[in-house]
């Protein structure tokens, strides 16, 4: 992210439109940009902007909204870079105001979710109104779009009690992933360990193990939706700042 402008297109692509989880934001390119050797993902409030997908009477949440009220970005290495095992490190400063749902995560390709596998190196959102940091993995079951989760949700106070200025600082999220386990860390504190002996897909994923196959990386800032909760417009524009993304692999 050292050169100002858009992230390196040889590595990163963008999601476009309303993507997942009935979130409030419309994803677009211009909300992710590199400045001062950092990647900034910015959520913004829009005024009077029409939803180009709008269809009156539609039951599809993506189409029944007449207006785009918020925009943000999701960048992904899908189709450009995938990784099997290694150490993943992301140094970032996350937004924590109402409605914020920033994430660092991975998905597999070649199968539908969740049989493709999902690793959430970091998520932040409110659970019953209380902020939490999450570290999770999900894989497939015998039912379509139904996942088996190994989740760890840590109350945000676990971090802010030790450092009241925690949210104003950069922190390092790390995943160590090898043939035996996925280990997820925040500032060298182990948050969750997922043995690969447990992560076997159900019948839809044909009993495969998604975490013995490559995954691609996603960085995004979502708003609201099923987990983000009520959006505090006083916190908009909202910025998620990423200093670096590093992946180390054994030769």
Residue ranges, per PLM feature:
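GH16 jelly-roll
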Residues: 2-251
């Amino acid at each position: 992210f050292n050169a100002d402008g858009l992230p390196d297109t040889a590595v990163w692509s963008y999601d476009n439109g309303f993507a997942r989880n009935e979130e409030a934001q419309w994803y677009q390119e211009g909300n992710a940009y590199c400045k001062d050797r950092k990647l900034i993902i910015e959520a913004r409030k829009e005024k009077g902007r029409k939803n180009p997908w709008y269809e009156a009477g539609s039951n599809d949440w993506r189409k029944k909204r007449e207006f785009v009220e918020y925009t943000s970005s999701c960048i992904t290495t899908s189709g450009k870079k995938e990784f099997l095992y290694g150490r993943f490190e992301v140094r970032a400063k996350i937004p924590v105001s109402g409605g914020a749902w920033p994430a660092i995560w991975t998905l597999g390709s070649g199968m539908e979710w969740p049989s493709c596998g999902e690793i959430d190196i970091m998520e932040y959102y409110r659970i019953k109104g209380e902020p939490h940091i999450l570290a999770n993995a999900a894989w497939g079951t015998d039912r379509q779009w139904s996942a088996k989760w190994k989740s760890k949700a840590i109350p945000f106070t676990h971090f802010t009690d030790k450092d009241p200025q925690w949210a104003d600082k950069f922190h390092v999220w790390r995943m160590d992933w090898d043939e035996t386990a996925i280990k997820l860390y925040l500032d060298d504190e182990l948050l969750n360990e997922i043995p690969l002996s447990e992560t076997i897909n159900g019948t839809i994923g044909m009993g495969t193990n998604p975490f013995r196959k490559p995954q691609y990386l996603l960085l995004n800032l979502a708003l609201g939706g099923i987990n983000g909760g009520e959006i505090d417009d006083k916190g908009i524009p909202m910025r998620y700042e990423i200093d670096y993304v590093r992946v180390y692999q054994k030769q």
